[in-house]
Amino acid sequence: MAKRQLGLGKAAKAKKQKTETSQSTAATSQKPNETLRVELNEEADADDELAQLQALWNTYSKSDKENELMVNGIIHECDRLLRNWDEKNEALPDYFHAIYALALSELAKYKPEETSQCFQMALERLDAGLAAYPKSIDVNFAKSRVLLARIPLQYISTLEVSSQVGDYPNVSEMLDEALSVYEVAETEAEARKEYSKFNEDNLDILQALDDVLDMMDNFCKKEEEEDEEKEDDDDEEEDEEEEVIQLAENHPLYHIQATDKYNFWWRNHTLKFLTNVTKRTENTTQLQRELCTRLGQSYLQEAEVPANVYTTLKYDDDYAGLGELQGLQMEEGQKLAQESFKEALKYLKKAQDDDDPDTWVNVAEAMISLGNMYEMDSPDQEKWYDEAEKILVRANKATQGKYREILENLRGEDEGDE
């Protein structure tokens, strides 16, 4: 799999620290009207404190996760429940430990000066949960999420281009640990046939991995952009010719950037996630579409390098006579790109929504890219172009001309009336 050049999801963004805090967060569960209304599951007991905690966490996890007040409320409620259960000498359920730890890790976003402490407390809570429930699906999924969240906030944010392995923890080992714990939860959920665990909330773990890999892939680019902003306009032409900064082999992120191991892991486990989602009894159409979209995008990005090799060696006179580029011969690049584009199409077609023309256009654009991997004006190329055109005409009509430009480009027209 080619290294991701664009990323599959949104690049991880630093969260703005809230400037206003409440002095009454401990009373969150007692004064819900001061925060928000929490909806309980129909089967949940309104007098069940643990059910209320679950509902509060579910409300937060489905929100934009920008509510420090709610996070503090969840943590205070967990503290209270923990004291009460200790007094009763009763064991709390596994999901309690997961919620408590996740809330502590979320707090790290709002209190950057306490990042290390927040993650340490979160991991200690998870270890306590695993001591009581070694094979808990919820606790293991939560631990994977916390370990992934810690990497950018506690470690990558402190790195510079000049950083060396000996001065920082081994980021690769931390990443491996997070993925290993995820696999424990995944395997256990499959073994118990608890397919409901493969839901939107736990899909966030795979998205978190994608964001972390994105951050690592773009680490040097960020440094370069910051440097360029400080330079004069006179150096603009020179800047454009500069190559992306290469990390030294002793940099903490070097080996992660240099391998496709984690990209393959992401795809393989996203495929597993999709397989398990299809086994759920309830309607999961939207979740399946989301997964298929992500998988389709990953194959599109996998095709980028071989496609560029093929088109460059085939059509760029500056490379005339060159036998290979980036380790690939022209025919090899063509074949690999065709295979990846076809795989992308398989998933993008499954991701189509009759009410969302953008999803149709994703398919059409993949068809055009695939057509570009065939000889000019060949039957194969015309076949893919024709199919793409039909889709674009439909999408253009449905959106009153939104895709007119791409349709004209495909037709080679200056104007279009569709």
From Swiss-Prot:
It holds the Pfam family Nro1. This is Enhancer of translation termination 1. Its main location: nucleus. Residues 224-241 have a biased composition (Acidic residues). Required for correct translation termination and probably involved in regulation of hypoxic gene expression. InterPro entries: Nro1/ETT1 (IPR024318), TPR-like_helical_dom_sf (IPR011990). Gene3D superfamilies: Tetratricopeptide repeat domain (1.25.40.10). It comes from Meyerozyma guilliermondii (strain ATCC 6260 / CBS 566 / DSM 6381 / JCM 1539 / NBRC 10279 / NRRL Y-324). GO terms for biological process: positive regulation of SREBP signaling pathway; regulation of translation. Residues 1-36, 222-241 are annotated as: Disordered. Belongs to the ETT1 family. It comes from the Eukaryota. It is found in: Nucleus. Residues 1-11, 21-30 have a biased composition (Low complexity). Keywords: Nucleus, Transcription, Transcription regulation, Translation regulation. GO terms for cellular component: nucleus.
